[in-house]
Amino acid sequence: MSDGQARDLMAQRFRGFLPVVVDLETGGFNAQRDALLEIAAVTLTMDAQGNLMPDDTHAFHVRPFEGANIEQAALDFTGIDLDSPLRQQVALSEHDALGEIFKPVRKAIKANQCTRAILVGHNAAFDQGFLNAAVERNGIKRNPFHPFSCFDTATLGGLVYGQTVLARACRAAGIEFDNASAHSARYDTERTAELFCAMVNRYKNLGGWDLALKEQGMDED
């Protein structure tokens, strides 16, 4: 399969949507009120054999928006130090962080001949809710992600491996997971991307995708 054929397959595999893995670390559970503190995204690509794999990672520290609530319990859970000199030096505003995430996502959509990105996340509704709230709060008109459709690796992990916790699902898939590194947006996104790819590829290798195409009358035969 050529690179062009791989791009065609990616465009067809998820009905024109490009899966992009996203993780957000936040100051609580309320998307309207609580701060967005970290955001990371991993774009995916497909090799000549039709296997899905992680491509590029983009990750940013985010300055809390004005008036944002931050629960101490959330900081204790994530280990984020808001007073870290390094964090204060590199953190971006929500608007700029979203812009830096959306640019490579749009580029990947175009490169893979897709029409839109679809968010992949572990407990994806949480990340999607915070992402949509931040987009609205910052008046961003062109969100490359579908506003409500998503792929949830907690649900898929339960289906494929009988595990819904990210660390346990990764280990069931043969993916190393370091608990000490968890709850960093970059780390969690990269592990979630590996997990999603492993499940999609497992389904393909077991013949599920070919069967789905055949049942829909879309197989080459």
Curated annotation (Swiss-Prot):
Keyword Iron: no
Cofactor binding: number and manner: Binds two Mg(2+) per subunit. The active form of the enzyme binds two Mg(2+) ions in its active site. The first Mg(2+) forms only one salt bridge with the protein.
Cofactor: Mg(2+)
SUPFAM superfamilies in the record: Ribonuclease H-like (SSF53098)
Site label Important for substrate binding and specificity, positions: 29, 77, 126, 148
Superkingdom assignment: Bacteria
One MF term in the entry's GO annotations: nucleic acid binding
Active site: 183 (proton donor/acceptor)
GO biological process: DNA replication proofreading; tRNA processing
Positions that bind Mg(2+) 1: 23
This protein's UniProt keywords: Exonuclease, Hydrolase, Magnesium, Metal-binding, Nuclease, tRNA processing
Any one annotated GO CC term: cytosol
Entry binding sites for Mg(2+) 2: 23, 25, 183, 188
Record EC number: 3.1.13.-
Residues covered by the Exonuclease domain: 20-196
Family: Belongs to the RNase T family.
Function: Trims short 3' overhangs of a variety of RNA species, leaving a one or two nucleotide 3' overhang. Responsible for the end-turnover of tRNA: specifically removes the terminal AMP residue from uncharged tRNA (tRNA-C-C-A). Also appears to be involved in tRNA biosynthesis.
Record text on subunit structure and interactions: Homodimer.
Protein name: Ribonuclease T
Source organism (scientific name): Chromohalobacter salexigens (strain ATCC BAA-138 / DSM 3043 / CIP 106854 / NCIMB 13768 / 1H11)
Record gene name: rnt
